[in-house]
C-alpha cells in the first residue's frame, strides 16, 4: 500500500524502507538514489527539489521499496507499486524504458544508480553513486 504525504515537497513511499530492508535482508541490500535536479522535466517545472530512491534486496536484487520526494511524488509512486507487485528486479527497473522528458525517468535512473551505471549524472556524481 503506498504511503503519501501531500506536503511541499510531496513525499511518497511503497514497500520497505531501507532500514526495514536491512533488518530483513542484512547486508544483502542495494539502493539507488537519483536527484530530480538531473531530470529535464523537473527543470521544465522549475522545481528540481527531490529524488527517487529504489531499494533492492535478496539474491535476485528484487525491488523491495521505493521512495519519491518532490513534485508529483504521489503520482510517481504508482510506478513503484506496479514494479513491486510484479516482483521486479533491479535489472528490470534499470532496463525499463521511460518517456523523455518525464519525472518518471527517475525510477529507471535510480535503478541504474544502484547498478553503478547511471546515464544522467555528471562523472563525479557517478563515482560517488557507485561507491
Residue ranges and their predicted role:
Residues 5-131:
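Flexible, glycine-rich terminal cap/loop adjacent to redox cofactors
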Amino acid at each position: 500500500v503506498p504511503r503519501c504525504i501531500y506536503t511541499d515537497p510531496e513525499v511518497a513511499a511503497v514497500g520497505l524502507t531501507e532500514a526495514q530492508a536491512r533488518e530483513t535482508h542484512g547486508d544483502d541490500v542495494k539502493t539507488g538514489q537519483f536527484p530530480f535536479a538531473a531530470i529535464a522535466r523537473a527543470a521544465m517545472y522549475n522545481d528540481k527539489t527531490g529524488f527517487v530512491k529504489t531499494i533492492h534486496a535478496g539474491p535476485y536484487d528484487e525491488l523491495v521499496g521505493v521512495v519519491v520526494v518532490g513534485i508529483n511524488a504521489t503520482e510517481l509512486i504508482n510506478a513503484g507499486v506496479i514494479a513491486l507487485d510484479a516482483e521486479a528486479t533491479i535489472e528490470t527497473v534499470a532496463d525499463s524504458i521511460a518517456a523523455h522528458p518525464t519525472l518518471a525517468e527517475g525510477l529507471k535512473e535510480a535503478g541504474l544508480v544502484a547498478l553503478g551505471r547511471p546515464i544522467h549524472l555528471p562523472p563525479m556524481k557517478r563515482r560517488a553513486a557507485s561507491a
